[in-house]
Every structure is written in structure tokens, then in C-alpha cells.
Amino acid sequence: MNTTKRILAIQSSVCHGYVGNRAATFPLQLLGWDVDAIPTVELSNHAGYPIVKGRTLSAEQILDLYKGVSAANPSGYECLLTGYARGIGSVKAIMEIVRSVKSKNKKAFWVFDPVLGDNGRLYVEESIIPLYREMLPFADLITPNGFEAEILSGMRINSIDTAFKCVECLQQKYKVPRVVISSFVVEENGVEKLYCIGSSIYSKSFFVLIPVIPGIFRGTGDLFTALMAAHIAESPDCTESLASIKEDKLKKSVEMALSSVHEVIQKTADRISALGVEEYHPAYAELCIVNSQNSIIAPSKLFEAVYYY
């Protein structure tokens, strides 16, 4: 009997590079998960390249693919990971799939990355925002970046204190049991600092101060969310309700995921330096995921989260 944990990942797909499901699938497999991946868009590469080819899948196509993988996997899924989707129809299709997965396995753990944009710029239609807010109460964990957390909560983040107020708003207003703001920058005493914070209704809130590695690296949020899903939904025999994990698993999962992502970024930055190229090309900054297998499985140095109160 196959006891390997199975996850359904629904987000963007690229032929070249490491964003969306391309950034998520291999790391999840390394950490012991069987991955069924459904694309919301199929692109040649990410949008940071000068030329991007591909297509957006319709809601009908997404649902059709789900019907196929669902029939092929009658035992269902222990975990569900959702990320970038383009258009209202695609978002509604994802919510329909979430309901279906959870109806077949009430213990299924949903990790929802509400991809809206970053650095003050939306990547999606504004009409998606209210739909995401409607979806929040059904998620077991959400992993917005700072910009996305601001949009969903309607609050401004300009300090670590306001970031935690933003998290509190999301938990109280939308009843989300676990919130991790994957990254946000605030100025402290004239110095910009990068933070990740997390909060669970089952344990204390915490934060991690992240050393900044200069550069433009795409797919880091997708990798982080995949690693969060792998670690927090980990269960030895999959009989325990994953949606009722009450110990400090969130804090430990963030420490592991952040440490792995940071090492992957550092390896990528080192590769760029070793190339010695004068003219930047986005291909040079594709995440070194394949060469970072040890960092994904067991990062050499763990970040230590600090309790907020």
C-alpha cells in the first residue's frame, strides 16, 4: 500500500525557470510528497523576461484537469496548495476544487498563497481581491507577502507592530487560523529591514529578521509556500487531522522554510557572481533549486524565530 503523502498544487507553470509549480514540485518531492500539479497558466518563462509566450487556462480547462487527476487518485489529498491564478473564472474554479478536495478528505490542509502582486504593483485584476477575501475563511494557512497582506486587510504596514496588527485583523475578520506574512520591508532608525512574521490561533506570534541578499530573484515566494506546506502538513501516518495541529509547528515550519529559501538564494547569488557577467539577464537569476537539494532537505543553518510577546 502506498503511504506517500499526496498534495495537489494549483498555480502557474513555466517551461523554463523556477516559479509557480516549477519552483514547488521538486522541493515537495524531495521532502516526501507525491505532487499532482494543475497549471492556471502555461508560459514559456516568467514575466521578468523580455519575451513571454504561452496561454491562460480557462476555468473549464482547470476543472477538467482536476476531474482527471481526481479520478486517477481516488484516495484524495492530504494537502492542497494554491497560488497564482489569472481571472475571476480561474479563481472560482480553484475554490470549487478546494471544496471538492475537502469534501473527500475533511483532514485536508489548504495552504493558500493569495498572489496579488508585490512592491506596490498588482499582478492580477482588482476584481479578484474580493474573491480572495471570501476564500480566506476556508484556508488553514495563508502566506501573503506584505503588499498582499495590506490589500487583504485594508491596513498599512510601516513597522513590525503594524504588521502584527494586520495579521490580527486577518485572523479576527476572516477567521484564518494561521497567517504568515512571508516578507515585508520596514525602516528602523534609517535602515531598511526585511522581516517574516507568523501567527497561529494555537500559539504565540513570532518574527524572523532576514539578512538581505542583493538581487532580483523570482519564485522565492512560491518556493517558500511550497516548503511551508511540506513542513506544516507533515504527519507520520496521515491519520491525525492536519487542520488541528496545535503545537508550535508553524514557528518551526517557518524557520525551516526560510532557512532553505535563504540558502537557495545565496547559491543563486554566488552563481551570478561566478559567471562574472556585465549585462544582466533574468536567466542568470533563476533559482538554483536542483543544486540546492541538501539545503531544501536540511538547511545547514536554521533561522531562529523570536516571539513577539
From Swiss-Prot:
Chief site of localization: cytoplasm
The record lists ATP as bound by: 182-183, 209-221
Tell me which cofactor or cofactors this protein depends on.
a divalent metal cation
Q: What is its EC number?
A: 2.7.1.35
Keyword list, A-Z: ATP-binding, Cytoplasm, Kinase, Metal-binding, Nucleotide-binding, Nucleus, Transferase, Zinc
- Pfam families under this entry? Phos_pyr_kin
Please list the GO terms describing molecular function: ATP binding; metal ion binding; pyridoxal kinase activity
GO CC terms: cytosol; nucleus
Q: What does this protein do?
A: Required for synthesis of pyridoxal-5-phosphate from vitamin B6.
Which taxonomic lineage is given here?
Eukaryota, Fungi, Dikarya, Ascomycota, Taphrinomycotina
The protein, known as: Putative pyridoxal kinase C6F6.11c
Q: Could you say which enzyme class this protein belongs to?
A: transferase
The text of the family note is:
Belongs to the pyridoxine kinase family.
What GO biological process terms are annotated to this protein in UniProt? pyridoxal 5'-phosphate salvage
**Signal sequence, renumbered to the chain:** none
Q: Record's NCBIfam families? A: pyridox_kin (TIGR00687)
Keyword Metal-binding in record: yes
Q: Which amino acid positions bind substrate, per UniProt?
A: 12, 123, 222
* Cellular localization per UniProt: Cytoplasm; Nucleus
From the record, give the transmembrane residue ranges. none
Species of the source: Schizosaccharomyces pombe (strain 972 / ATCC 24843) (Fission yeast)
Catalysed reactions, semicolon-separated = pyridoxal + ATP = pyridoxal 5'-phosphate + ADP + H(+)
